[in-house]
Design a protein with these regions (language model features):
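Short coil/turn segments at beta-strand junctions that form active-site/ligand-binding loops
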Residues: 8-10, 53, 101-102
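A positional/architectural concept
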Residues: 20-51, 59-60
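Acidic active-site catalytic centers that drive phospho-/nucleotidyl reactions
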Residues: 15-17, 41, 108-112
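Conserved functional loop/turn residues at catalytic and ligand-binding sites
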Residues: 13, 17, 52, 74, ...
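Mg2+-dependent phosphoryl-transfer enzymes with acidic/Ser/Thr/Gly-rich catalytic loops
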Residues: 34, 72-73, 77-78, 86-172
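Substrate-recognition element of Asp-dependent hydrolases with the DxDx(T/V) motif
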Residues: 45-68, 79-80, 116
Length: 172
């Protein structure tokens, strides 16, 4: 249970490595990372988008495969190569007319710290670093890449009366 008024939430922003994918990365022969993504996380992201909850990514990484996957699932804001994530976060708020208390940010490590100090509802996977776990309003029982995004989104959609509330829920 998230101890926050989830009715206020209009957007959920995710980091990628350690949140949407596991903490480990395989490398291809060119030195590029290969990530494994959770299908149930993907289902929840596309459902949230259909139900009007904005989902976004702010990551330091750069992967065309990640961009394509999440845009396919309905994300309109996929920010990559963000060396200072807080600047991208502030731009996101301005562009969408949102305030900190409208946002859940799901992060797992120190590069997420500044944003998580600002947002109304900071959340993290169970395997996040200690500093992030301590500052989170909600620590998912799921590890990054293993259902954490689904867990957070399902709690938000249920609280807003949008989980399985329309025929949109029963397909991709």
């Amino acid at each position: 249970m998230i101890e926050y008024d989830l009715e206020k939430i209009k957007a959920v922003i995710f980091d990628v490595d350690g949140v949407l994918s596991a903490n480990t990365v395989s490398m291809d022969e060119n030195g590029l990372p290969l990530r494994t993504l959770n299908i149930k996380d993907g289902y929840a992201i596309q459902l949230a988008a259909k139900m009007g909850l904005k989902c976004a990514i702010i990551t330091g990484g750069d992967s065309e495969a990640i961009r394509k996957r999440y845009e396919y699932l309905g994300m309109t804001d996929v920010f990559m190569k963000c060396s200072v994530k807080i600047k991208t976060y502030e731009m996101f708020l301005r562009e969408h007319g949102l305030s900190d208390d409208n946002i859940i940010y799901v992060g797992d490590d120190i590069p997420d710290y500044e944003i998580m100090k600002r947002v109304g509802c900071p959340c993290c996977p169970s395997d996040a670093c200690e500093e992030i776990r301590q500052m989170s309003v909600y620590v998912s029982p799921y590890c990054g890449g293993n259902g954490c995004a689904r867990d957070v989104l399902e709690l938000v959609l249920r609280a807003q009366g949008k989980w399985l509330s329309s025929s949109k829920a029963f397909g991709w």
